[in-house]
Design a protein with these regions (language model features):
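Beta-strand/loop substructures that line and gate deep hydrophobic ligand-binding cavities in soluble
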Residues: 78-130, 134
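Hydrophobic ligand-binding cavity/cleft-lining segments
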Residues: 1-39, 44, 138, 144-147
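Alpha-helix N-cap/helix-start motif
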Residues: 18, 28, 59, 85, ...
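Glycine-rich portal/gate segments that line the openings of hydrophobic small-molecule binding cavities
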Residues: 36-82, 87, 95, 100, ...
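Short, contiguous strand/loop micro-motifs
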Residues: 27, 50, 76, 122-123
Length: 147
């Protein structure tokens, strides 16, 4: 299980917008090459959303299934990509004059990565933890500087 948290000087509704609106996705998820539009009916539990991602020299599609959601409070996705499946959740908590965003996630390697995971587990865990923290820092910058 991975976890990262950050305080952002913005109300929960503004942060939720940046977490869920495809037009803001690239501002805090730099690996996203193309964010797919929201499905008919919008974002809701059971909806599939997705993106085309480029990381580590590979370009691939990622499918996200909204597993749970309470607008302006939390959203959780089940993610499926070629090298891993994951569960990722964002909790949005009013925190004095700021808002605390807590991201948690669990990952299951698949494909070629699954066989290498026992050897590379420590390295992969550090990379995932660092990536989660850096994405939250980018989210804070995007939310706080967007007019």
């Amino acid at each position: 299980m991975y976890k990262a948290a950050i305080e952002i000087a913005a109300p929960p509704a503004r942060i939720f917008e940046f977490l869920t609106d495809p037009k803001h996705l690239q501002s805090w998820q730099p690996d996203v090459v193309e964010a797919k539009p929201l499905p008919p009916g919008g974002l809701q539990v059971g909806a599939h959303v997705g993106a085309t991602v480029q990381e580590y020299g590979r370009r691939f599609d990622v499918d996200l299934l909204v597993a749970s959601m309470k607008r302006n409070e939390h959203i959780a996705y089940r993610m499926d990509a070629p090298t891993a499946s994951a569960y990722v959740e964002y909790q949005i908590v009013p925190w004095g004059p700021k808002t605390l965003v807590v991201s948690t996630g669990a990952m299951r390697p698949k494909g070629f990565l699954r066989s290498l995971y026992p050897l590379l587990q420590g390295l992969i865990q550090r990379m995932v933890q660092r990536k989660m923290a850096s994405r939250l820092m980018l989210l804070r910058t995007a939310v706080e500087t967007h007019a």
